[in-house]
Amino acid sequence: MSTNNLSSSASGRFSLSAAALHILAMALMLMDHLWATLLPAQDWLTCAGRLAFPIFAFMAVEGYFHTHSFRKYALLLALFAVLSEVPFDLMYGGTWFYPVHQNVIWTLLLGLLGIHLMETVRKKQKTWLYLLTALLVVLSGTVLGTLSMVDYYGTGVLTIFIFYFFRGRKWWCLAGQLLALYWVNVQLLGGLLYPVHIFGMEFEICQQGLALLALLPIWLYRGRQGYHSKPFQYACYAFYPVHMLILVLILQYLTR
């Protein structure tokens, strides 16, 4: 069996590789951004887009534990965060400089810097020091994410920490991910409520709560990298600023 296959594990169980999750997350993000620019009447696009960030947050944590150099990983994220800011500002603010909202790569970078600090302390094998550091990192990361107005604000940084603390496939890790993401997305973020009719009964579903569905593909990931190459890696990073810039240019052409 080729190691480049995006699905079907060696054990015969269906699984998704890291490459497949990246592609899925990019497709979901594109849907959300199509709604934000060209197709604002198609609410189903932004509903699907709710699944993108949890997948990116999960893969960022996995990337931390699989990278050979955190320094290079962080610098690459910082580079594309800078390159993505103008396209992001144009898309969400309609201007080259929109200081009240920063792009999602800054969110990922803040979360990973916090994880790196916690892991550095954890390796000193002093439990009390690690627990104290973890508490301070979670609090400061959440506050800093909110004050700096990164995408998803402090709750976005907190989502990354959730996948760090509940990393693994033990039942309590999966339960922790589910309960913590419910708290973050439904209780903290909340948002629009959609009426749904099933068997004559009406229910209201929180739009942001659809982010919990991201756990389905995440739980199908079993540590397999799948297809990997330098061009593919950089294409995944470049997709973020490039697709936003293209959408902005199309929108400006259609509305001029």
Give the label of every model feature segment.
Residues 1-256:
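Alpha-helical transmembrane segments and their immediate juxtamembrane cytosolic regions
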